[in-house]
Amino acid sequence: MTGTYHQLAPFRIDPEFVGRIWGYTDLRPWYEKVSSNGPIGEVWLTGDDCRIATGTHAGKTLAELFREASKVLLGEGAPSSESPLLIKVIFAREKLSVQVHPDDRLARKYGQPRGKTECWYALSAEPGAEVAVGLKPGVTLETVKDEIQQGTLEQSLNVLPISSGDLVFVDAGTVHAIWPGSILLEAQQNCDLTYRMYDYGRPRELHIEKSLEATRLKTNAGKVPATVLNDRTVLVDVGYFRLERFLGDGLRSSQSLLSGKEQPRGLAYLFAANGKGRITGPGFEPVDLPARSIVAVPATAPEFEIENLGALDLIRITPNWPR
């Protein structure tokens, strides 16, 4: 259902701190205020239960606003009325499980609306940090099945070194694992469906049969070289999302953030990887953008300017669909 809204101004979203056994109990200096009794592994920036922090809809969840005003948020070209992307920051103190996500077809077979293709942008990485993405050449599903039972699956994983600023694309069907040493901004289809293959002895459910069904031996996963343009760096531009990085001092207009193919304009998210900014425009109160916070820019947002208030490193994330 769409409400009677005709225009929505940019608004900041409060994060949701999600407990994970492999996470940290203290996220400083990245996040100062954490509401949890146990280790935090993920900070959801655009989860359905995240609450709007500014503007006339402050206090509502993101899911509630999408139910009320999906077309105003997404634009006329959107293929669905649901929130298209889940954006999060991942803090891994221990190795995550070796896992795989289903594609759209397989997810629907098991009663879910969509699968999960994702990407990781390294906000920070220690020397020697690594992630596992895909399987080594020659590995078969039988090999994977045997190694799951023997606890030796790691030896068949394709291991990538990761540095700050790297972008890793992980399409559905890719066996993968996040390891300690990096802090990752993840953009993904709005689905939290994971099939665990191997979990390092932790007492969590495994999904071996479904994970083998979901696994593709060859995928398009891997590091994506950045494309440097005059006013931005395109980190990735694939079927479900586009990530761009903007640096620079002074003011930047909302029009200058658009890419050439965004006609008509759709929903966008602005994430402050570092530094801070402020969004101002006619008809709405200024919206502050502190470090590691996110602002949603609805398709119908009025024109605005974003001011760099100090070392602003801006990541713009947009859902991709035919326009």
Model-found features: residue ranges?
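Short acidic-glycine-tyrosine-enriched beta hairpin
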Residues: L157-F169, G281-A301
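An exposed, glycine/acidic-rich loop-and-rim segment of catalytic or binding clefts
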Residues: I148-Q150, S156, L167-F169, V175-K223
